[in-house]
Every structure is written in C-alpha cells, then in structure tokens.
Amino acid sequence: MRALQFSEYGSPEVLTWRDAPLPHAGAGEIRITVRAASVNPLDWKILSGAMSGGQPLAGPGYLGFDAAGVVDELGEGVSGVSVGDEVFGRGQNTQAERAVLNAWAVKPSSIDWAVAAAAGVTGETSERGLRLLDVKSGETIFIDGGAGGVGAVAVQMAAVRGARVIASSSEANHGYLREIGAIPVLYGEGVGGRVRAAAGGRVDAVFDVAGKTPVEELVSLVSEPSQVVSIANFAAGQAGARVTGGGADSKPMEAMAEVAGLLAENKLVIKVQTFPFDRAVEAYRISQAGHVRGKLVLIP
C-alpha cells in the first residue's frame, strides 16, 4: 500500500507518495479502499509543524482526515455496513490507498467519489457548529469565511434549516455565495459594519470558520458572546465566545447521515478541484495559500 507521507516538518515539497504499512480496522471502525481523499487546512498545519508543540517528528508522518471508498474490512462490533459498500466519512491518515474510518455513511449513488470525499470533515464540522448555535428557521446567522470547504457547506446547511445566511468572502466569490444561498459581504477590516448593514442590525448567531476577524468584532454582532462559535480562533473563549474542535461536541455518525441525505436530495452542492496523488504538493500549496473555493481532493 502507498500513502502520502513526510519524514520532516516543512513545506509541501517534503511530501512523498510511497509504500506504507497496511492499516486494519479496529473495534467500531471500517477500512476502505480509497477512491478519493480530501485536503483540509489542518493537514498543511500538521505538515508545517505548527501542531507539533515543538516536539520532533517520531517516524513517518501521515495526513488526511476524510475519504470515500469501498469497504474492504470491518472492525469488531460494526453493523449496518458490509464489505463492498460504497461509503464516505472521517478517519485518520486517509490520504492513502487504504484508510480506516471511524464515522461514515453510505455514499449516495448520484454523488461522485470526489464530492463524497469532500463531505466528511466539512459536513461534521458544519453540523456541529450549527447545532451548538441552535440555528432555527427565521434566524439570521453570519458565517465568517463562507466560500471555503467548511464555510460553503455550513451556508447550505443553515439555509436548509430555514435561516437567513450572511457570509463573508473575497469579492471574487460573491457570486458563488449567492448561488449557494447566502447574502455576501466582503471579508476583512470593517466586516462587522457590513454585516450589520446586510442584516439590518445584529444577527442571531456567528459561525467563525476563518479565524481572521477579531473575536471582539464578532461578539459585537450578537446579543450574547456565547452565540459566537469558532473552529479557527482558539483564543475566542477569552471574549466569551465558544471554541469547538470536536471531542465531546461531536456527533459524527449523525452528521454523516444528515450530509448523505442532503447530498442525495441535491440540497448540498460541494465544489471540488481534483488532483492525482502524485500532484499532492500542488494541492497543498493551493490550500496553504488560502481563498480556496470549495474543496481540494486527491485521487489515488
């Protein structure tokens, strides 16, 4: 089996596509033959060493947190899925020819592999953020960073819930935001004022996907600081906002099921750019540069 890996922290150029040990499904897990695996910002942050806490790399490093493929091994206690089923979901070290998933759903037959691979992390993260904010029909939510992988999925999931969605992006992505159901505002300095103008005042909730706007500015948009949830600014709690990175907040199997339903009903559209695994360096460079519309996906 081959996998994307690195033997030192650094830029995307340190990545190699080479032989790796074959993983096996543990209890409550499944293994898949990977047909597509997505690239998330966390991947290049890990690659750069930003998440290492200053500790040296112990052995080869592997990347990837979501993928789609065909089930080829079931762990102990797994039910409701069989070898040969086509699935997508979340796991670890998914940028490989085989990968183990710990949360999954059956892939809708109408959805291609790349789109399914892009739905794991984005779907779970979006569902978690909207659930923590308890977004309801008729409410207004501001999503800061609406054109990227998580942001675009969150926009659509909030719209399905009946919310009015305001989302920030570069001007080049405003047309895209309108297509997926959001009122676009320009990101960057002064975004709070632009959100107020679009909303006619305060909003009911803020989902901070980008982590670029000062949290104090985001908190000023809502009546209670706890109505700001961030996945990208780990200092947001200092201003009374909530930070979520998964853990106890996460309900991944429920999230995967919701996303699968939305994909099957064409209520969720995920834009993807695909790259063969031997062009992973290029995909990582694009991800690291930012302002990606939708998701970047690697194909073995």
Residue ranges with predicted function:
Residues 68-91:
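A glycine-/small-residue-rich N-terminal strand-loop-strand element
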Residues 90-103:
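A structural motif shared across PLP-dependent enzymes of the aminotransferase-like
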Residues 119-188:
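Mid-domain Rossmann-like dinucleotide-binding core that forms the NAD(H)/NADP(H) cofactor-binding site
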Residues 191-201:
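Short amphipathic alpha-helix with an adjacent loop that forms part of the alpha/beta core around
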Residues 178, 209-269, 277, 300:
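Glycine-rich phosphate-binding loop and adjacent beta-alpha segment
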Residues 82, 109-112, 134-140:
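Short helix-loop-beta connector
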Residues 11-14, 19-68:
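N-terminal glycine-rich beta->alpha transition that marks the start or flank
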Residues 1, 33, 256-300:
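C-terminal hydrophobic helical "lid"/dimerization subdomain
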